[in-house]
Amino acid sequence: MKKSENLDLITIGRSSVDLYGSQIGGRLEDMRTFQKYIGGSPTNIAAGAARLGLKSAIITRVGNEHMGRFIVEQLKKEGVNTDGFKIDQERLTALVILGIRNKNDFPLIFYRENCADMALSTNDIDKKFISCLLYTS
């Protein structure tokens, strides 16, 4: 991995695909259609920072499958540096299914057992790449 060049922010941690139920106000049990988004606090922060004009990057793991490629491609479109991504050949990308009932209630189900980002380790971090780090949980 190359040294980070003038990055304002590097996040590290969870990357997932969030599937939001399109029928706002309904129960998850009743959802028929979903919209697909990138998810995970570090992923969302990196994308949001890029939208605000900052040079951001993320260190994470995703699976070598459709959902993992979706996250990488979406972040590249947002202008996020993805040099810190590790592609996991054995694990799938995390998935979250969510609904929006009202402003205070949003049911969700995490599919994260043995997923790629849960296998992220210190060995995945190139010290030359890090210039700053924001920890979120």
Model-derived features: where do they sit?
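Glycine-rich phosphate/adenosyl-contacting loop at the front of the ribokinase-like
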Residues: 2-80, 108, 120-123
